[in-house]
């Protein structure tokens, strides 16, 4: 079994010397009353499975990790409109700074 080190953003805190790409948080309308929240450009050193698990537990929603086939990147998809909650969650847990978050759909 491989012993891999996983970056846990909930324990490590924000490292001020690291440069992250801007995280994009947007929503897409599925039907007239239902929507999904998409979180893109999550830093590669964050374990997406653990991050998704924390988001689903915190917001009481379903979610999944999706593959973007245009550039082979991964993003998180949550059911419902959770843009503000995700933004506050990222800032509160010191995962990224507020200046590195881009909100779409306002």
Curated annotation (Swiss-Prot):
InterPro entries referenced in this protein's UniProt entry, alphabetically: SUI1 (IPR001950), SUI1_dom_sf (IPR036877), SUI1_euk (IPR005874)
Record carries keyword Aminoacyl-tRNA synthetase: no
Gene Ontology biological-process entries: regulation of translation
Keyword Protein biosynthesis: yes
SUPFAM superfamilies named in the record: eIF1-like
Keywords noted in UniProt: Initiation factor, Protein biosynthesis, Translation regulation
PANTHER family: EUKARYOTIC TRANSLATION INITIATION FACTOR SUI1
UniProt function note: Additional factor that functions in concert with eIF-2 and the initiator tRNA in directing the ribosome to the proper start site of translation.
Descriptive protein name: Protein translation factor SUI1 homolog
Organism: Acanthamoeba polyphaga mimivirus (APMV)
